[in-house]
């Protein structure tokens, strides 16, 4: 239960329903919508491609956690990242960051080279859904998070630490 979606949900619940205690049922993301449909759960946090197809499954939106976060903080959602162990030499860490950046840039310039791989691993195979998913999650922040992205990550960690969801670290969150 260490995902961004889980932490956003908990922050939202703490902010909106201060004394409400929700029972969390951990499960892989592809099982969330079926669990709600089969009434094994009252609601679920829908992520990845599910956010584009939930209406087709008879589900309705109650709260968009991303929109809630963006309105509350005026920052983008800090989704996913590539992490490196803190004991890796900083020069090596920065070289790795540069290589990953070049790989992402190559993918931006050649979007269809990865399409077979994407289709093999996608939960939803509809081409429009795949394109919506890529369009939403693969963006300029993928290449360089910049100051606003760093602020989003720092704010996310500050809020999750303050609410007791994670332990505070004295180390910088950024290697380069």
How would you name each of these model-derived features?
Residues 1-43, 49, 151, 155:
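Bilobed "Venus flytrap"/periplasmic-binding protein-like clamshell domains
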Residues 11-14, 142, 161-162:
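Short linear sequence elements within intrinsically disordered, low-complexity coil regions
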Residues 16-24, 124-133, 167-172:
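Short, surface-exposed acidic
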Residues 23-120:
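Pocket-lining segment of extracytoplasmic ligand-binding domains
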Residues 66, 73, 145, 149, ...:
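Solvent-exposed, flexible loop/coil residues
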Residues 88-159:
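Secondary-structure end/capping motifs
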Residues 159-176:
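Conserved C-terminal helix/tail region of periplasmic/extracytoplasmic solute-binding proteins
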């Amino acid at each position: 239960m260490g995902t961004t979606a889980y932490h956003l949900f908990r922050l939202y619940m703490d902010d909106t329903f201060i004394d409400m205690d929700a029972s969390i049922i951990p499960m892989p993301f592809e099982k969330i919508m079926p669990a709600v449909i089969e009434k094994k759960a009252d609601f679920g946090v829908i992520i990845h491609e599910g956010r584009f197809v939930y209406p087709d499954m008879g589900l309705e939106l109650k709260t968009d956690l991303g929109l809630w976060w963006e309105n509350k903080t005026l920052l983008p959602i800090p989704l996913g990242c590539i992490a490196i162990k803190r004991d890796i030499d900083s020069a090596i860490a920065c070289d790795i960051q540069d290589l990953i950046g070049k790989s992402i840039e190559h993918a931006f310039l050649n979007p269809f080279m990865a399409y077979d791989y994407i289709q093999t691993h996608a939960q939803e195979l509809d081409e429009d859904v795949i394109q919506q998913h890529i369009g939403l999650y693969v963006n300029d922040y993928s290449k360089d998070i910049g100051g606003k992205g760093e602020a989003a990550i720092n704010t996310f960690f500050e809020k999750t630490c303050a609410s007791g969801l994670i332990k505070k670290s004295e180390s910088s969150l950024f290697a380069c």
